[in-house]
């Protein structure tokens, strides 16, 4: 069965571990699958696709994804391609490689959706608050689908291909098959007969507040604070939902604060996955864990 893949880049996507997560789920099957930090929703969408009878809840608190859900993303994407005058017979990567001048022309038009730019070099002069065609939500959708995962106002070299268009159509269709909510995490939530997947925001330590962390794009471009206190709230959530025929699979970075709390509070099994990843042109070795609590 063909996998449903998000038609955009997403930091922290668990898709690379789909096979491992699926195996754990099959060994601990429940009638409900709950992903409380669902992000791009790659795992819940594919679980629903593979296990048709499964009841799936995906909670997403991410302004970029929420804009994608509010708008007719396929219509906005096609309107964006038409606006920059892109030939749908031409793959964006081929355009970037073989016709760089034409790519740069389309990129200038694209950047003008968000900013007033120099007509000669395309350099941004000032932000554009309003656009005559695209509203703010539509502009965010264009940034997600055509720029670098919503983090830029310049075209990526993969902004269009027939396969990307097909992936978007499949993704949008799949969204209609699951229940989606957009709530900040609450330790008082209660579930039963569920496989609960917990992958809290990717965190980055900041210098001024030793115990504070920032969840990458958890609620806005700047994120919101996710502290060690919030790790404690996650522990309380698990405790509240034990003894209700639930299974928990927690995902995180090796040796982080949450992993220590899990070891101290539960009988649990840790599975460490090592992999290599290229970030900004640099190859780095990564290690992350799954923690299974029954």
Regions found by a protein language model. Name each.
Residues 1-34, 42-46, 281:
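S-adenosyl-L-methionine
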Residues 33-47, 58-62, 145, 193-210:
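Conserved proline-anchored active-site loop of SAM-dependent methyltransferases
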Residues 38-41, 164-168, 253-257:
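Short, polar loop motifs at secondary-structure junctions
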Residues 54-176, 210:
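Class I S-adenosyl-L-methionine-dependent methyltransferase module
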Residues 182-187:
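Conserved SAM/SAH-binding loop
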Residues 195, 203-249:
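SAM-dependent methyltransferase catalytic-core segment centered on the flexible catalytic loop
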Residues 231-278:
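Conserved Class I SAM-dependent methyltransferase catalytic core
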Residues 279-294:
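Core SAM-dependent methyltransferase catalytic element
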């Amino acid at each position: 069965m063909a996998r449903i893949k998000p038609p955009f880049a997403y930091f922290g996507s668990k898709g690379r571990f789909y096979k491992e997560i699926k195996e754990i789920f099959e060994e601990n099957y429940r009638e409900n699958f709950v992903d409380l930090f669902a992000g791009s929703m790659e795992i819940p969408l594919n679980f629903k696709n593979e296990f048709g009878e499964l009841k799936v809840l995906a909670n997403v608190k991410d302004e970029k994804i929420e804009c994608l859900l509010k708008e007719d993303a396929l219509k906005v994407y096609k309107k964006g391609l038409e606006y920059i005058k892109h030939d749908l017979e031409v793959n964006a990567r081929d355009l970037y490689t073989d016709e760089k001048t034409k790519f740069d022309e389309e990129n200038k038009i694209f950047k003008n959706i968000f900013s007033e730019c120099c007509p000669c070099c395309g350099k941004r002069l000032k932000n554009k608050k309003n656009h005559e065609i695209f509203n703010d939500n539509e502009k965010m959708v264009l940034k997600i689908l055509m720029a670098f995962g919503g983090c830029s106002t310049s075209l990526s070299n993969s902004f269009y291909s027939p396969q990307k268009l097909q992936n978007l159509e499949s993704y949008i269709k799949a969204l209609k098959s699951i229940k989606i909510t957009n709530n900040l995490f609450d330790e008082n939530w209660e579930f039963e007969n569920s496989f609960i997947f917990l992958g809290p925001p990717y965190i980055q330590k900041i210098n001024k507040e030793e115990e504070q962390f920032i969840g990458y794009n958890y609620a806005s471009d700047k994120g919101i604070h996710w502290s060690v206190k919030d790790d404690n709230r996650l522990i309380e959530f698990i405790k509240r939902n034990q003894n209700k025929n639930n299974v928990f699979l927690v995902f995180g970075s090796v040796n982080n604060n949450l992993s220590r709390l899990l070891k101290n509070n539960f009988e649990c099994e840790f599975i460490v996955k090592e992999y290599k990843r290229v970030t900004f042109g640099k190859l780095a070795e990564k290690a992350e864990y799954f923690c299974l609590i029954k």
